[in-house]
Amino acid sequence: MLINNAYFENFKRIGREYEAARVERQARKQQIIDNYGWDSAELKAWYEEDAAAKFPYESGVCKAYRAWATSICRKETELEMDDFLWEKEVRDFLETLRGAGIETFVYTNQSTAVMENLHAFAAEGCTMLGLCTITRQETRWGEEELYEVQGIRFRLN
């Protein structure tokens, strides 16, 4: 797994810029309310601006980033996906991993809808390489512990 992944680092930068702009917009909203009131044209314009300021990433992209960041925090040698993906998220998730240069990932989700994701991965061109066990490091109550986790390894084709 690429620990210093420029692709994901750029996502982080853009996300932080979005958050800073959102905080600034919220501060401006309060200034508009204080200076012009609730029924002002300025506040209506602010609402239009805020509605246009959509978060830059779809949820599948966010889940790919979170899987990468969490895998790094857990000191894993390979990307682990432990979350369920909705049908609308699968393509964005996999395209994001491909864009980041990730070649394989281990799917460890244990929800009742795992089969949906397995078939969706195959439909999007992934190859199931087989069952595997990975080791993750977690910090619980201040103690670092190693955990063996069962999963299915996929190759991104």
Where are these regions (language model features)?
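An N-terminal amphipathic alpha-helical segment
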Residues: M1-E116
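Short, aromatic/basic amphipathic alpha-helical patches
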Residues: M115-L129
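C-terminal edge-of-domain segments
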Residues: T127-N157
